[in-house]
Amino acid sequence: MLKIFENTLKQVLKAHVRPNKPAVELDPMQKYHKVGEYEVGADDHTPGNEKYILTVYQNDKGILYQALSPQKTDRLAATYIRRFDERLGRFRAFQNRKNGMRYRVLEYLDQFMKQVKEQIRSGNNSINIGVLTDTHYKDTDSVDFYGHNGLIHVREFSYLENFGLLHLKAHLGDWIDGSDPGLISESELIKLRNSFKSARTPFAMIKGNHDENDKFDEHHDLKASFPEDEFEKIMWPTMYNQAALRYVSRYHGVAYFDKDDLRVIFLNTSDVPYIIDENGKKKYDTKLTLAIREDQVEELIEILEGSSGKRIIIMSHGNPINRKGGNAMKYNGRSLHELLVAFNQNQKGRMHSHNVPPEFTLSNDFDFTNVENAKVIAYFCGHRHVEDQFRINGIQYIFFNCSALMGPNHVLTTKYNKNWNRQIDDITEFAGYVVNVDLVKGKIQIFGYGAASSKRVYDI
């Protein structure tokens, strides 16, 4: 792993936004190119600074590999392995052969979580939430954009559970890029699901606009590559099969989690009907159609009506409104925001939709007059591949940066990520968060690792 993990750790943890960094310095074991065995240790930045045998070898295609085996073991199989990449002119980061995680990343996350623990209050009404979003897993070995790194990011994010700090973790959607053939994307979702699910920490699997695989359909002008409810069938049974998550039904992706006086509600902003024409093509491109529909809204209303005594955070992939208060979804974003405002004001009424297709019409009744001591305090979302925040009608809208690698030389890379100059095998390759919601202090603290602000603080 690049030596930047050590040299910039304090800077990343303390600086609000890390500027473009200079040319990176490679790790000491990069110098071993000659086939053979070498004794390496702390001076070579080995795992845990322990003594290892470094074996350098070539495969039958002439590709150079390095493998690390502990000196104190009799096993022949290496624990860590990496290969030389001609595109980079160096070896990649060492990965654990069993789980694919990189030990230098885990060492960095050890320090990150130590810093987080020192800055949060433990006890009642201090809730910690791990947040990851927009991993855009894709079946390509990219060194500067979406690719296999998306799965690695999910596995390394799940490592945060080992510290016993998280009460909940959530992936805010766009698990996959949705640009691979259907069967491949389905297998990607299964790998991601298995890497994210947990017996230790309650988790939310939120759907993103890329998770219907419509990007592949768009580029190939073919029939729908996913059958109806493919994401839902792969991901949601696992999510709903948790005692810690409560729900009205298992059909729409709506669920909620309670801890002390905090309630976290999960929504699906890719709530789009599966309608195909006589040629097998979809009527609605889910990638371009962020929306929420009547049945899902009905479940949200039912949950809100039973939320007395709760401070509430909503989580979804897309943001319903923009910083000017306008609709940020294709359908019903502004209506969703107005419903949350009505809840905070203990109102009673009926929702209406104007100039929307029949599939997206809202006509839900709501009555929040009997709800006591409750408020929606924040709305967490991804989708935009930036960090941002705005407060409208007393609700904090907070955006989280994408975990997916966005190199500076790609058209799709947002300005925010270009400023990070993100690089493979560097701390800027990924991004993730731990959010502390302290209802006693009235603060939301957001701690970021990788291509993320180290700390953001907002009033509740």
Task: Show where each model-derived region lies.
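Acidic, His/Gly-rich catalytic cores of divalent-metal-dependent hydrolytic chemistry
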Residues: E429, N436-I460
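N-terminal active-site segment of His-dependent metallophosphoesterases
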Residues: Q95-E186
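Solvent-exposed loop/turn segments at secondary-structure junctions
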Residues: T135-K138, W175-G178, N209-D214, T269-P273, ...
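Active-site neighborhood of phospho(di)ester-bond hydrolases with catalytic His/Asp-centered motifs
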Residues: V131-T133, K169-D174, F203-N209, I313-H317, ...
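Extended active-site neighborhood of metal-dependent phosphoesterases/phosphodiesterases
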Residues: Y108-V116, D180-E299, E338, Q345, ...
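Glycine-rich, flexible loop motifs
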Residues: N7-Y80
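Loop/turn elements at helix/coil->beta-strand transitions in domains of secreted/extracellular proteins
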Residues: N125-N128, G164-K169, S198-A204, D260-R263, ...
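Active-site-proximal segments of metal-dependent phosphoesterases and phosphodiesterases across multiple
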Residues: S185-E186, D277-V297, E305-I377
